[in-house]
Structures are given as C-alpha cells and as structure tokens.
Design a protein with these regions (language model features):
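Conserved RecA-like P-loop NTPase ATPase core
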Residues: 5, 71, 105, 138
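Short glycine-/polar-rich loops that comprise or flank the Walker A/P-loop
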Residues: 1-3, 31, 68, 117-119
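S-adenosyl-L-methionine/SAH cofactor-binding core of RNA-modifying enzymes
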Residues: 32, 36-100
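Short hydrophobic segments within beta-strands
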Residues: 6-8, 36-38, 103
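Structured adenosyl-cofactor binding patch, chiefly the S-adenosyl-L-methionine
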Residues: 108, 112-156
Length: 156
C-alpha cells in the first residue's frame, strides 16, 4: 500500500512539524508514504474566500494520483473509531486498492467540487482542529491503524 498525503500550505509550528516527522517515520515502517504540499493562497482584503478555496482545491486535485482512492478530510465527513479506520483500510486493500490519497485543506477548507471528487469524506472528530494539527492527528491515526492491523500493542 502507498499513502499519498496532500497538504495545503506549510506547517508553521515547530512542535507540529516535529510530531509530523515522527509519525511519518513510524508510518514508513509499514507503508510507502509520499507527502505533497501545495502552496496556500494568501487571503487579503482584496481577495475573496471563494477564489482562495477554488484555487487551493484545484491545486490539490492536480496532486491526487489518478489511481488512488481519494479521501478528503472534512468536518461533515464520516467519523470512524481507530479500529474502524483499520478495518476500512483492510477492506479497501482486499478490493485491490493499492493507493490511498488523503487531502488536508487550508484554513478555509475545500470547494464543494473537490469534495464531490472524493470517494470518501473523513472527519477526524466532531471537534474542530487547526488544519496543521489535523495533519499530525491524521498521521497518528494512520500509524495506529497499521499497528491494529498487525496486532501490535501500540493501540490499547
């Protein structure tokens, strides 16, 4: 399995960058991981939020591999437990899926058009997280899913 991660904008907070690197290293023990960061648009007085969302969404769409199962993180998406995520991943593998692509948006999220292109809309929680924090939480949950699938004791 190969995991593609598409992030909008750089992770600015050092503690989050360090956590992301830690969990990328852990996750790479189980699967191939490729991270693509697309440039975020600057939101100024003159710019319109809809233009920013459309532009960032187009960049993300261009970065998604054609043969990947495309997952958009969205607060209206499906919520899963950690075990549920692991079982969902296993079912995809059993159907022949070899690539997953997770997209984490910028501060304004994604366009409805990009959401409609996703095979799965995934919510990390009912709570709201910053887009940068969502990256770290997603990586930890993907790592946790790998340990669950292999019966390892990280998940208690």
């Amino acid at each position: 399995m190969k995991i593609h991660l598409v992030f909008v904008g750089k992770t600015r907070e050092l503690y989050l960058r360090e956590g992301i690197e830690d969990f990328l290293g852990r996750l790479r023990r189980y699967v191939q991981v490729e991270v693509k960061t697309v440039r975020s648009e600057r939101l100024t007085r003159e710019s319109q939020a809809t233009r920013v969302v459309a532009s960032e969404s187009e960049k993300v769409a261009a970065a998604v591999p054609r043969d990947a199962h495309f997952i958009v993180l969205d607060r209206q998406g499906k919520q899963m437990s950690s075990e549920g995520l692991a079982h969902w991943w296993q079912r995809l593998e059993q159907t022949g899926c070899r690539k997953l692509c997770f997209a984490v948006g910028g501060v304004l999220g994604f366009s409805n058009e990009l959401r409609s292109q996703a095979q799965t809309l995934l919510a990390l929680s009912k709570m709201t997280y910053t887009h940068e924090m969502s990256r770290l939480i997603l990586l930890e949950q993907l790592y946790r899913a790998c340990t669950i699938m292999r019966g390892e004791k990280y998940h208690k």
